[in-house]
Every structure is written in C-alpha cells, then in structure tokens.
Amino acid sequence: MANEVIEKAKDNMKKSIAVFQKELGGIRAGVANASLLDGIKVNYYGVPTPLTQMSSVSIPEARVLMVTPYDKSTLDDIEHAILASDLGITPANDGTVIRIVIPQLTGERRQEIAKQVGKLAEKGKIAVRNVRRDAMDTLKRQEKDGDITEDEQRSLEKQVQKVTDDATKEIDKLADQKSQEITQG
C-alpha cells in the first residue's frame, strides 16, 4: 500500500513532466516545428476543432510550415484561427494550402521567450510539488491510521523526496535545453 503511494507519485510526476514537454514544444524557437500549431482550434461548423484533426502539417523548408486542409472549404477558417492565435505568425493562403514562414527571432523576442520558458518550468515544478505534497499527506494519514510505522513513514517520505528532486531536475534540464535553443537560435 505504501509502495502504491510512491508509484502513484512517480506516475503523476511523469505526467507533469510530459505536460511541460508538450507546452515547451509549442514555443517557437525560430525554426519550423509542427507542434507549434497543436494548440490552435478552428471554428468548424460552429465547433472548435483542433487544427491537427482538420489538416496535415508538413515542413518543406527549415523555416516554413505548410498546412494542407483535408477539406479545402476550411482554408479561410484555418487562416483566421492561425491569425487569432498568439503565436505571432502570419499565414499565407494560396487557395490550396496555407504556408507559414517562421520569422527570425529578434534578440528582444528571444529574451521574452526565454522568460516564458522559465515561467512554464516553474509551473511544472509547482505541479510536481503538489504531487509530492499529496503523497506526503497520504503517508502521514497512513501512519496516523496505523497502516505504517513512523520509521516506514520517514523512509517512504525520503523516497518521495528523491522522486521529487529527480522530476525537478528533469524539468530544469528540459527548460535549460529549450532556453539554449532559443537564445542561440
């Protein structure tokens, strides 16, 4: 039962890291990346639909994304959704596909994005710490209820802390990699 607490904490921390990685993937680093468009929803017959379900996204050149809709009648809707996003990119609609040229990042914009990475990393660490707190509370409750001894509780709390430290280091490592990718362009 006590090992379940640690396994659950590990699993939830892995999920927190996965969410952080997905958010990092959506940050523009001056090169074309299909995951940049993952969060965009297109108003498709009144229903907000993920862009990735309505089209294929390819990368014909290093700084160009090409969006090919499955239904050509949705081109304008897709173009408007991309414009309305806060990505700072401008789509070019040629009647059959939408091309998005990813502009070079200015030094100032690179700094803003690096700060955004830092904020996302902090959000990820908070999620990990919340998982840690829940695990610690569960262990305290188990000790209080007599399910585990005080020594077992301390030992398990150390294990939870180690898992937390590892997850935090992983988030820091991912954030550092992304920051370097952005600042070195």
From Swiss-Prot:
Region (Disordered) residue spans: 140-166
GO cellular component term of the entry, any: cytoplasm
Signal peptide, first to last residue: none
Keywords assigned by UniProt, alphabetized: Cytoplasm, Protein biosynthesis
Superkingdom in the source lineage: Bacteria
UniProt xrefs under Gene3D superfamilies: 3.30.1360.40, Ribosome-recycling factor
InterPro entries xref list: Ribosome_recyc_fac (IPR002661), Ribosome_recyc_fac_dom (IPR023584), RRF_sf (IPR036191)
SUPFAM superfamilies reported in the protein's UniProt record: Ribosome recycling factor, RRF
CDD domains reported for this sequence: RRF
Pfam families xref list: RRF
Compartments where found: Cytoplasm
MF terms in GO: ribosomal large subunit binding
Main location group: cytoplasm
GO biological process: translational termination
Assigned protein family: Belongs to the RRF family.
Role: Responsible for the release of ribosomes from messenger RNA at the termination of protein biosynthesis. May increase the efficiency of translation by recycling ribosomes from one round of translation to another.
Protein's UniProt name: Ribosome-recycling factor
Originating organism: Lactobacillus johnsonii (strain CNCM I-12250 / La1 / NCC 533)
